Amino acid sequence: MQGEDARYLKRKVKGGNIDVHPSEKALIVQYEVEATILGEMGDPMLGERKECQKIIRLKSLNANTDITSLARKVVEECKLIHPSKLSEVEQLLYYLQNRRDSLPGKEKKEKSSKPKDPPPFEGMEIDEVANINDMDEYIELLYEDIPDKVRGSALILQLARNPDNLEELLLNETALGALARVLREDWKQSVELATNIIYIFFCFSSFSHFHGLITHYKIGALCMNIIDHELKRHELWQEELSKKKKAVDEDLENQTLRKDYDKTFKKYQGLVVKQEQLLRVALYLLLNLAEDTRTELKMRNKNIVHMLVKALDRDNFELLILVVSFLKKLSIFMENKNDMVEMDIVEKLVKMIPCEHEDLLNITLRLLLNLSFDTGLRNKMVQVGLLPKLTALLGNENYKQIAMCVLYHISMDDRFKSMFAYTDCIPQLMKMLFECSDERIDLELISFCINLAANKRNVQLICEGNGLKMLMKRALKLKDPLLMKMIRNISQHDGPTKNLFIDYVGDLAAQISSDEEEEFVIECLGTLANLTIPDLDWELVLKEYKLVPFLKDKLKPGAAEDDLVLEVVIMIGTVSMDDSCAALLAKSGIIPALIELLNAQQEDDEFVCQIIYVFYQMVFHQATRDVIIKETQAPAYLIDLMHDKNNEIRKVCDNTLDIIAEYDEEWAKKIQSEKFRWHNSQWLEMVESRQLDESEQYLYGDDRIEPYIHEGDILERPDLFYNSDGLITSEGAISPDFFNDFHLQNGDVVGQHAFPGSLGMDGFGQPLGILGRPATAYGFRPDEPYYYSFGSR
């Protein structure tokens, strides 16, 4: 059409239906716009109709609002609603007033990890309805003064909020270039203008295929500069406010200062509201762009983490949700996590737990879960008092799972296990265990309980009342290996709790069978092996439940998995403390089977240590001592292992050989000879390999060396050796090895090797001061953690 053919444009607006907004407190007015181009004679030449809608938000609507007055005001101010529809508007407002915000179930279903879109704000809410055909007019407004630029950007934003318009806007390079230029040049002039333009680009950022456009105009870098500037401005506002508050506090009678402070405070509140709208939309845009890790790295290099952690000091829930969501995304990379550590993030997050806002609390807990993989941050969480706060959340169904995961990570550290005893955590966990209706307990719950049961104080709380009885009943009913692992941890602690297991020895022994699931059998065996109770008649247990054939059968190389075989060896070590049991086992031919296993597993220190511990137990008893010394090659193996690089193995060997030497003179000579040879090996090698000349033979004083080497039997010089127990020298000095260093294990102070004894005698007449059970592979193997891990969330 030629320009002269059209004289003017006729626009007609026709009102339509009115309805309530599905989620907000707002009315939706449907209307139709009809545009007609008239010719020179006034006749219509071209016409177009478009259906539109206007949203009237009713922020002030609450339970006490006068509906009649509000309806009248809405009809008066909105020209799209005919006065005849006043009663209809009133009914809709009444419905909105009484409508519940959302159903709890629905809200839970719709909950997303992504924050909500920024709401409408002052500057974008204008009465004018934008039209995609009027884009040229809106672009022209961007070249005018600030108020016109704000208006033009608001109209373009109105269009951009409708995803259907984005493709068309993308083709309008003039508009996008003008918006980017105005933002770059004028963002300091008007917060509303900056917010509008960033919001327009945010609409594009919601779709990954538009990210190239935002990168092209360098909007991301500009947003980071704006955020940094606004955060610094906020600090200046706070400083100014703080100075005026201090002046008022120092001169309470001065009303002028009070009025000045009140005025400044109101101004500050208004500025903060606008600033937080800007921060929210800018950060959301960056969060969308950060889905590309290369872009995220650029943000990290521009200190995005520091900016976000600073923003945690705000009180605006919606802004905080966005900030914490961003931090959660960033926290999966170590560099970002380290930046958060520098900014003391845990101290800032602790104030949000608990909080009234459900979404904020949920996302904060998820950020803490990510951070809790770091040992130092777990330590910080305990220091700032998060333990009782997280424990309190276990009772809330919405947060129970995520809070438990964080607590589980904290429970991995031995230092913190005992602290759980001073919260109400354990009673809550026990309640959850017994209320769990599924055949298998939640992995997170049982893993957490397994860790806590490694501490003696916690175990006392677990066993209170019928705690152990209920656990045993459930574990045996469901054949649950993880629940039995928890029971096994309970059984390892000396004291009253160990004696509670006397009632369940039969139940546990009945599970030791090849017909049961191997994992479950391992845990039952491990629990029985922990029951070093003097009054327990192990011979009766072995005979009644026919355990000896099972134990012997599993010792054959390749007969079972290594984990099960190791538990069998440990079990044999426990029952061998009993004289009659040791004899029973010796008669069954278990000792040769152990030696064969020792040959097969000689590279595995754990196996070696536990097998020689069985020998150590057996040499205490006359019946088994003779078998070991006279009928097997066990002493020879022990001599070979005397100088093993593993300290634990050396210790058990030395003590076992000392007992053998005490009862057998022939072996005593061999043992002493080997000890002497090893102790003096370097010196002897030097002497035998060199011919000392005249100048060297007096290096060692006046005493001649020859008598020690050539004259007489070397074994006739007992002053050169340790005595039979290997600890006391001929001068009566005590070897330093006699003393154990103490350390912290599972939150309890224990001996260096987890088996300190007193110098008294045990129930079988054995001196406890020499040796106790070596640390077992259960929970302490170097190749696997003692706690149960679960999948990352």
Curated annotation (Swiss-Prot):
Coiled-coil features, chain-numbered ranges: none
Record has Repeat as a keyword: yes
A single BP term in Gene Ontology: cell population proliferation
InterPro entries reported for this sequence: ARM-like, ARM-type_fold, Armadillo, KAP3
The keyword Calcium belongs to this UniProt entry's keyword annotation: no
Modified-residue entries (Phosphoserine), positions: S60
UniProtKB keywords: Phosphoprotein, Repeat
Alphabetical list of Pfam families matching this protein: KAP
Post-translational modification, as annotated: Phosphorylated on tyrosine residues by SRC in vitro; this reduces the binding affinity of the protein for RAP1GDS1.
Highest rank taxon of the organism: Eukaryota
Biased composition (Basic and acidic residues): 103-119
Residues in ARM repeats: 333-373, 374-412, 494-533, 578-620, 621-662
Region of interest (Disordered), residue spans: 103-123
One term under GO cellular component: Golgi apparatus
GO molecular function: intraciliary transport particle B binding; kinesin binding; protein phosphatase binding
Assembly and interaction partners: Interacts with SMC3 subunit of the cohesin complex. Heterotrimer of KIFAP3, KIF3A and KIF3B. Interacts with RAP1GDS1/SMG GDS.
Function per UniProt: Involved in tethering the chromosomes to the spindle pole and in chromosome movement. Binds to the tail domain of the KIF3A/KIF3B heterodimer to form a heterotrimeric KIF3 complex and may regulate the membrane binding of this complex.
Protein name: Kinesin-associated protein 3
Organism lineage: Eukaryota, Metazoa, Chordata, Craniata, Vertebrata
